[in-house]
């Protein structure tokens, strides 16, 4: 038996940059008992992320940028090393990630491979992230990257082994990045 969910109330608490909802709903459990819940849900739209790798050079391209939420949560500099990513903004995931790759890393990638879609924080955030990988070469470098407008992004081309070590040392603490680096390692694409 599937659980039945009845929306009681959806109150918007904030609609500034993204939308924060206060949701009241009844959940009918498998045993038939109905339980009322109130939760705040943050709707930031869906996104996509990509790990660029070069199997010949044994390198990956990551970015470093300021992330205010990490700063609020104790990351003193607020800087985070991560894979290129962005919100879909009504684009298809592959279209989005190609745009983000060129804006943030400067690489105009060829074939991209979609791996999976994951919720990263389903207890309170609606975002579904589409995960991609793509090989890159030096000849695909179209510009310096660094993002657009108010973004201040540093492009990092790192040895793959160093990126894996940076997970162990805590220098890489972004979930999507750890997932993609571990995928690349277990897929043996860099062997």
UniProtKB/Swiss-Prot annotation:
Keyword Endoplasmic reticulum: no
Annotated positions binding Mg(2+) 1: 85, 104
EC number: 3.6.1.-
Motif extent (Nudix box): 86-106
The keyword Protease appears for this protein: no
Pfam families membership: NUDIX
GO molecular function annotations of the record: hydrolase activity, acting on acid anhydrides, in phosphorus-containing anhydrides; metal ion binding
Annotated keywords: Hydrolase, Magnesium, Metal-binding
GO CC, alphabetical: cytosol
GO biological processes: nucleoside phosphate metabolic process; ribose phosphate metabolic process
The reaction(s) this protein catalyses: GDP-alpha-D-mannose + H2O = alpha-D-mannose 1-phosphate + GMP + 2 H(+)
Subunit record text: Homodimer.
Protein name per its UniProtKB record: GDP-mannose pyrophosphatase
Chain's gene name: nudK
